[in-house]
């Protein structure tokens, strides 16, 4: 209720942890959790918006996904990245074409969030996009995220991964080894 009254409310990290603990406790004793999307849309503070986007993901508020998708146009890279991550985890497949469309004009961290979200969606419609994204990527971290997405995407994703591996040079071959090795994969 207090977020409805003060849209400019600032939260410190500790406040967010406390608020999350209160929400968890209320859930355990049988109270319904509120719908967080209204505070994403009304809060004036970036960190508060990000907190509520994370809560949407943690509480699997799939009904908030269509409204949350509007945050893909947020000026803040952090808000945009968290919205992308959350939409992927919520399996909001309708967002995939928009993610592909916006990919090339995003900073590297947002590109990685887009790739991870597409991997979470697993629509089998993005294999061509992932293949091209790998070919065009010049950042090794981004290439690594793309390879992991392909490797875990589907049987066709694995075939695409194998195809890229066959044409890899000695410099990029290490990325494929790191993606396939289960111990290294756990470090993500």
State the predicted function of each range:
Residues 21-26, 55-58, 86-89, 117-120, ...:
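Core register positions within helices of long alpha-helical scaffolds
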Residues 3-57, 76-77, 85, 103, ...:
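Alpha-solenoid helical repeat scaffolds
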Residues 77, 81-85, 97, 101-108, ...:
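Alpha-helical adaptor scaffolds
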Residues 12-17, 45-47, 62, 77-78, ...:
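Alpha-helix N-cap/helix-start positions at coil->helix boundaries
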Residues 104, 108-155:
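Ankyrin-repeat and related helical/solenoid repeat scaffolds used for protein-protein interactions
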Residues 1-10, 29-41, 61-73, 92-104, ...:
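Amphipathic alpha-helical scaffolding segments comprising HEAT/armadillo-like alpha-solenoid repeats
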Residues 147-168, 174-181:
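Leucine-rich solenoid repeat scaffolds
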Residues 16-20, 34, 49-50, 54, ...:
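Alpha-solenoid HEAT/ARM repeat scaffold
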